[in-house]
Amino acid sequence: MRILFGFLVLVGMCGAAVAEPGRIVVSGHGAVDVTPDMAVLTLGVSHEAKDAGEAVSETSAKAGEILSRLDALGIEKRDVQTSNLSLHPVHKRYDSGNDAKIDAFRATNTVTVRVRDVSKLGTVLARVVQDGANQFNGLNFALQSPRSYEDDARRTAVADARAKAELYAAAAGVTLGDVLEISEGGGQGPRPMPMMREAMMADASVPVAAGELTVRAQVTMVFSVSQ
């Protein structure tokens, strides 16, 4: 009984546990760093005017120019989607404590754009600003085909789990057997990278650094063990 207790303590301290006699459970993690090949940005036009119709008209005109510019830059129509249309009253408040009154109207037209050639991103940002874009609500870098990188991370996670199992089995003086169960945990996809507000300028090309994305995977494996 003393030997069995020592085995359980050893394995527990190492991050694994014997689920039942003849079985050992381990977890493995894998990560792959990859350069993103796509950017997803949300941009828009906002305009304020005394008349609601004027606000909508001006915003629509600028949005139309931006859509035409994106088309001219080679952005496919399937990669451009209107994500928000809004019209709100702008209230003016008085120091006397009187109720606020409508002073103007603000119209906003926002689109989400996928840029499949990251090298064009700086040019796209600069050109749409020139055409009237005055709102940038986010920039995320992504992968067009993440599956192969996810599979690489999974293979690394499985290898990590097996290496742990072999180590624990050797340390405990038992023989590692076949895989009895394997399950995938919550992997972590590429994290979005925020765009700095300072990038909103009408230069020839806005400098943007894509960096790297990390694709992660996690597995839990159950092995048989024998004396």
Task: Please provide the spans of the model-predicted regions.
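Short, charge-dense linear interaction motifs
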Residues: R2-F5, C14-Q227
